[in-house]
Amino acid sequence: MANSPSAKKRAKQAEKRRSHNASLRSMVRTYIKNVVKAIDAKDAEKAQAAYVLAVPVIDRMADKGIIHKNKAARHKGRLNGHIKALNLAAAA
């Protein structure tokens, strides 16, 4: 338990930051989930539209340090790969 006033303030700030960051992480997961749902439904246009909306959010959270930049790159790469495979399957 924090005893000094500065430690109490830091604990309060950390708790506020933790809850805010949790909200932002949840938002990223929701955007990713929307892309995955469209991919699972084999809807290439909807998947591409959801991906275009998700990329700036993923990048912004990586810039803020909410998620690691490599994790952001991994998500974007894998989602884009699935969309490309979906488009190839539709074209074939």
Swiss-Prot record:
Biased composition (Basic residues): 7-20
Gene Ontology CC annotation, any one: small ribosomal subunit
One annotated GO biological process: translation
Keywords: Ribonucleoprotein, Ribosomal protein, RNA-binding, rRNA-binding
InterPro entries: Ribosomal_bS20, Ribosomal_bS20_sf
Top-level taxon in the UniProt lineage: Bacteria
Any GO molecular function: structural constituent of ribosome
Entry keyword Iron: no
Region span, Disordered: 1-23
Family classification: Belongs to the bacterial ribosomal protein bS20 family.
Protein task: Binds directly to 16S ribosomal RNA.
PANTHER family for the chain: 30S RIBOSOMAL PROTEIN S20 (PTHR33398), SMALL RIBOSOMAL SUBUNIT PROTEIN BS20C (PTHR33398:SF1)
UniProt protein name: Small ribosomal subunit protein bS20
Organism annotation: Pseudomonas fluorescens (strain ATCC BAA-477 / NRRL B-23932 / Pf-5)
